[in-house]
């Protein structure tokens, strides 16, 4: 993939396919590193599948025999000298705390570092397609933070205003852009 935001969108879509009602996306960025954590409360993966999930020929899909999302994300991290770690628990393993946590570390100074890309569009697209899912996003960089919490948005807006309405999506986009501009982030 040409930018990491597309990997993040792919992993979030995996979370949705696993029945997640809550998705947490956290980015911590320094001058030299980018850490990305994506967590959910979906069905999780059993130990056997978890061991093979970064193999491109391991997929839960029935429509095709390959799954490239996690393998490409892992490769993107490792080619910078970083890593990818996945922890997952099924409801049978942990009835009250099931789900999956994907954590990566990228070294930004490496010549093979894939740019983060457009997180604003990624989040807007994710929210547009899944307004009922709680999404908590935070990106810490340059001593500040850009964040989005759809649970808080729902509390403020009430039940009659859908989060994927054009007005709300426009506000989300402008709010995120304003936050990134304030931190000096360049897309």
Language model features by range: what are they?
Residues 11, 73, 123:
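Aromatic/hydrophobic pocket-lining residues that form π-stacking "cages" and hydrophobic walls in ligand
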Residues 2, 78-187:
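Flexible, glycine-/charge-rich segments associated with ATP-binding catalytic modules
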Residues 6-7, 16-67, 72, 79-111, ...:
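Conserved beta-strand-loop-beta-strand hairpin that lines the nucleotide-binding pocket
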Residues 2-10:
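Conserved alpha-helix in the HATPase_c
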